[in-house]
Amino acid sequence: FALGLEYCAFSGLIFVEYAMFASVSALLAAVQSGKANFDDVLNHINAHYEFTPTTFNNGAVNNPAGQNSGSCRVLAFAQLHHLNPLDTLSLFAEHYKAVAANPAGEDHQNIRQFKKYGWGGVQFKGQPLKTKVVVTEKPIDQKSI
């Protein structure tokens, strides 16, 4: 993965903000090999999408807007990219591993519900993710004017 750079037009500064992967395939490979964690997945999603807190159902769990936003982001991202259930679960990284290690547990209910019901159990009450508009324009060099 590479570091993402974000340019601030107001200050002219460039900030290193997030880990960014070249593609969804690269993100999946990094997560599945243990080189990326859940925070890396969320950072990748946040780098490419505007997030709107959205109510969603996942199996028997109702998630009000603003609660379980990480699960909302991951499931919406996976749905947008038509990922299969196993690839979707892998995006939960260490949290999915914790669920797999303790199948009878009560934690991480969104992961457990998705394991049980798959895409048939997921329903969003809106559109949680919207692709960010990327501006690639460089600042004008004042000396050349």
What are these regions (language model features)?
Residues 14-16, 145:
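Short hydrophobic transmembrane-like helices used for membrane targeting/insertion
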Residues 60-61, 68-109:
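Amphipathic protein-protein interaction modules
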Residues 55-63:
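A ubiquitous short alpha-helical element
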Residues 106-137:
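Long, compositionally biased
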Residues 25-27:
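Long, charge-rich, low-complexity intrinsically disordered regions
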Residues 33-53:
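Short, charge-rich, low-complexity alpha-helical interaction segments
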